């Protein structure tokens, strides 16, 4: 009996050790309360949610902001996802091509058809017309997917919660509808990965997200053992690091004009103004808008209102999504987001199926090809040179106050009349953000690391401006001389 007790005790000890070792070997999610300091990318972490799951073990191969992240992800996965790499040819204002007002793959990514204008249909309560929501609802209703990963607005009617992003694994239309409207702060889309992997009833999935989250998702999607995966992306630039920062941006920029109002979202629009959509908080209230010219914003708003990860991003156009929805390439033909066109980019056969499903379900209207006019390059470099973020990098003059409102309105009117429009406005926005972000990564990590982390298409744009624009070249040289 004594010998038997020893055997039992020994077996128990071995079993306990095995469990302890197994627990120790299992990747441990990072506590989100320590963000960003305890996360691998530190200040440049985009809070995509990957590290908040057991998939954290894949972070060095998936994160868009570690090592050569965006170059590794976009250049390395584009052909795998879409069947081919993009045509790298870029369109410039001086080119003689007759189609220089049509979106090219060099900037906008792989396309199976030209970028088109689109509106959502039969989607109430959207920030725009419901293009993204309409596609997602159609796919779920038709049985094309079993679930949708999206970011819900943690909105209980309280005006303080309007910008709080909450990732959900939506299995019903009502749950998908919680994802309506843009969330202006970093959102951990991938935080539901463990729930997804444990859900044996989900075999076909739609993942909705911005570029950095889509990149990380594409890097690990093979681990999920799903039969079909669809990815619906949005264009994205300059998110706030937290909901509090987004609210601070509005309160500081618009003073008391939004007091007591329920904000439904805001966008930096093609008329060089920030448009804030709001209502009075009642169930039947209709949306109204408050607008402020970019030029009248206080100079220090970028310091707290733009996440550091967004300053190191080169995936404005969401290169690895099957379908991408945005608005910068659309004409500003309405004073209301509720009736304005957006753009839709279809990248592959999966994307064609997604769009066709939404059209057949009468939740999507696709119109003519997106087009544009006007020169964009000089607008990009002039914007860059006057940017407080850039001036801080080069030790230049920092503006603390924006223009007086009337002068700002005049400037916005002139810029809208004289500046690039449609697709060419999108080119302006893409180039400006790529150039600014190149200067940022050059300043933080140096020339060699910067060149290694920037995807090929962005590097081509940077090289073009370095070769042709003396002002941009001078900014880059000033930053290089600091090291």
Regions found by a protein language model. Give the residues of each.
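A short alpha->loop->secondary-structure connector
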Residues: 222-234
